[in-house]
């Protein structure tokens, strides 16, 4: 992928919900919830403080994170769906 977010933004590849329930019922797209977790695939350089110094982000590529259902902006690059959001929109890292 050749996408690099700017400043304190990150790009996340959402982890999609299962297509079937444990009981074998297929879930149609119309009732699936928006994903709220994903894997970080790109991060910006960081945020500038008042002195112009760049503070790097805490999150890094490969982190699995939990974020708000409506956070960020959905984009598509070379057929891959991503969500771009600020680091502060992430609730936490999933271990």
Swiss-Prot record:
It is found in: Cytoplasm. Keywords: Chaperone, Cytoplasm. One of its GO terms (cellular component) is cytoplasm. GO terms for molecular function: ATP binding; metal ion binding; protein folding chaperone; protein-folding chaperone binding; unfolded protein binding. GO terms for biological process: chaperone cofactor-dependent protein refolding. PROSITE patterns: CHAPERONINS_CPN10. It holds the Pfam family Cpn10. Heptamer of 7 subunits arranged in a ring. Interacts with the chaperonin GroEL. HAMAP family: CH10. Belongs to the GroES chaperonin family. Together with the chaperonin GroEL, plays an essential role in assisting protein folding. The GroEL-GroES system forms a nano-cage that allows encapsulation of the non-native substrate proteins and provides a physical environment optimized to promote and accelerate protein folding. GroES binds to the apical surface of the GroEL ring, thereby capping the opening of the GroEL channel. This is Co-chaperonin GroES. It comes from Rickettsia conorii (strain ATCC VR-613 / Malish 7). The lineage of its organism: Bacteria, Pseudomonadati, Pseudomonadota, Alphaproteobacteria, Rickettsiales. The gene is groES.
């Amino acid at each position: 992928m050749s996408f690099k977010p700017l400043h304190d933004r990150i790009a996340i590849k959402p982890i999609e919900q299962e297509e079937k329930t444990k009981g074998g019922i297929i879930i149609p797209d119309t009732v699936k919830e928006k994903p709220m977790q994903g894997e970080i695939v790109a991060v910006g350089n960081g945020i500038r403080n008042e002195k112009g110094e760049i503070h790097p982000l805490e999150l890094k590529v490969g982190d699995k994170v939990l974020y708000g259902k409506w956070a960020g902006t959905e984009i598509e690059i070379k057929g891959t769906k991503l969500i771009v959001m600020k680091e502060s929109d992430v609730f936490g890292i999933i271990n």
